[in-house]
């Protein structure tokens, strides 16, 4: 049985996964999504671990396009027939569901797991300011769809200085973050 970890590029997380395999004396191979699509019809005796696409994109609009392409890749993989001795460690369908952070959080709460509180979605900065001022803490703003921390913005109000502090990985494009 072979173990294959798949993404568009190697990442530290994937390198750690491969290293863990070596520690267990199990070979773990890396493959790109393109390589997986090419070999999947003939692939036998394999467990496939799908990883999100690696990107250092800071333009939020381009990030959304990358996320859409990843969703389409997962949908395509989910429609392919696999040999009986090939399986996904994390199925394309499960990953598609997990890409919706709001739905995922609701599933976790429904199962009785403790999660960080989720504020209502503000429609303007004034609404966000009101929400944060009322709860007395900072928050992380994330896109609803996507994997990991991409597009995250940390924002906190400092009442003693009457100042808003924002940290982000996003870049300003045409005057808009």
Feature-to-residue mapping (PLM):
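Extreme N-terminal starter segment of soluble prokaryotic enzymes
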Residues: 1-4
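Conserved N-proximal alpha/beta basic substrate-recognition cap immediately N-terminal to
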Residues: 8-122, 126
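A general, composition-driven signal for non-globular sequence regions
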Residues: 6-7, 136
């Amino acid at each position: 049985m072979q173990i294959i970890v798949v993404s568009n590029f190697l990442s530290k997380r994937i390198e750690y996964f491969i290293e863990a395999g070596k520690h267990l004396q199990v070979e773990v191979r890396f493959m790109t999504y393109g390589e997986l699509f090419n070999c999947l019809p003939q692939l036998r005796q394999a467990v496939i671990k799908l990883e999100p696409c690696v990107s250092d994109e800071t333009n939020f609009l381009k990030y959304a396009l990358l996320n859409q392409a990843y969703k389409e890749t997962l949908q395509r993989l989910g429609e392919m027939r696999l040999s009986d001795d090939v399986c996904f460690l994390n199925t394309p369908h499960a990953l598609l569901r997990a890409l919706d952070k709001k739905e995922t959080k609701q599933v976790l709460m429904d199962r009785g797991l403790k999660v960080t509180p989720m504020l209502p979605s503000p429609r303007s900065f004034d609404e966000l300011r009101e929400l944060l001022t009322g709860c007395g803490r900072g928050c992380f703003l994330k896109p609803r769809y996507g994997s990991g921390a991409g597009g995250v913005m940390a924002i906190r109000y400092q009442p003693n200085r009457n100042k808003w502090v924002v940290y982000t990985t996003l870049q300003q494009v045409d005057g808009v973050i």
